[in-house]
Amino acid sequence: MASSYRPMMAGVLALIAFGIGIALYGYQQAIYPVDSALGYLSRAESAQTPEELANFVKAAKREMPESGNPVWSFPTAKTDYALIQRNLDDIVARANSISSLEPYSTEYNTGLYDIHASLENIQEDLVDATPYLYVSFTNILLSAVWIAVILALFAIMRKGRAKFRQEYENQ
């Protein structure tokens, strides 16, 4: 029994390590880029100059996927990455046009306020899409692999226990 205990514990530890690895990989691939983009958009919303705002929006664009929709079950335009990317391009263009205006003028302040409101809407859309990122095709596939490994480990343990009982009864 003691000789089979070590491989069983090694299998359990390997299973735990595999599960942690899958969780980290899934987060890094599906969730972190959008979370990082949300951080840049938040900084852009609080930016006080159009140049600063445009730089943060460009950084957010680089982090976000260029196309696709995380809500793959019932996709909407609200969470379509291509449309969000287009909105961010428009925001950069508006920020560049505002930068030529006189600071603290009515036009300048109105333009910045409009951009900040647009950024807030985009952030809300991305936050609404975030739960669906956890249910991406990749994450479902990796979870299925992890469950298959757990079931295989239990089958091996049951087979080992049956073999141990048979040896014990034969003594």
Positions of predicted regions on the chain:
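Long, solvent-exposed extracytoplasmic domains/loops
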Residues: 39-123
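Membrane-proximal, non-transmembrane alpha-helical segments
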Residues: 89-148, 154-170
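Short, Lys/Arg-enriched, disordered terminal segments
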Residues: 1-5, 166-171
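Hydrophobic secretory-pathway targeting helix
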Residues: 1-37, 138-161
